[in-house]
Amino acid sequence: MSKHQALLVTLVPILVASVLGSTVNGAGVTSISIPATAAGDLIIAFGSNRTSTPSPTPAGWASIATGTCNPFGTGSDRSTRMVYQFTDGGAQTLTFDGGSGDASADPYSGCLIFRGASEIGVGAGVSSNSTGPTLTIPTLTINRVPATVVVFSFYGDSITAAPAGWTISNGMAYAEYLNIWAGGNFTLSATAAEIGTVVEIY
């Protein structure tokens, strides 16, 4: 390599696929069918629950953050959990307890798959007892810059609009090359529970 040449280094993960598991069956189970990927890919996923207790962390996965709320009074508890896994590359089914015995076509779970990620940074759950069309994600102190930040909403409330610089994929949002995240508002597909999770990856 001459003194005039430079080595190009990818500093942040690259989004390679997105998957949305969009149903919960009569037993209250929601599952995401994750296709085969490359070994070492990072999968960030969430599972929602119609109780005050977030779904247990599935075997082989690690928990990042949880969020809970009770937006409509007694019996209206909602919760969500964000998890991650550095995969061996094989196809798999990720299953969460949906906390309800009623079948639904609402998206109870979903995931984003990244290639080139090395670590999980800080994560936070967003809890609110209010309802509305806006999910407010608070400030996240980024430990290593630049980073990719991922936001998930709650079941039935896909993200339809995000701050400038964010990309929306199947109702989930992410932003690359961030040096700071001072918080912001995300528009939801319905006026419902304002709940979600956010995480930094690099």
Positions of PLM-derived features:
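Primarily extracytoplasmic/secreted proteins
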Residues: 6-202
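Bacterial N-terminal signal peptides that target proteins for export
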Residues: 1-5
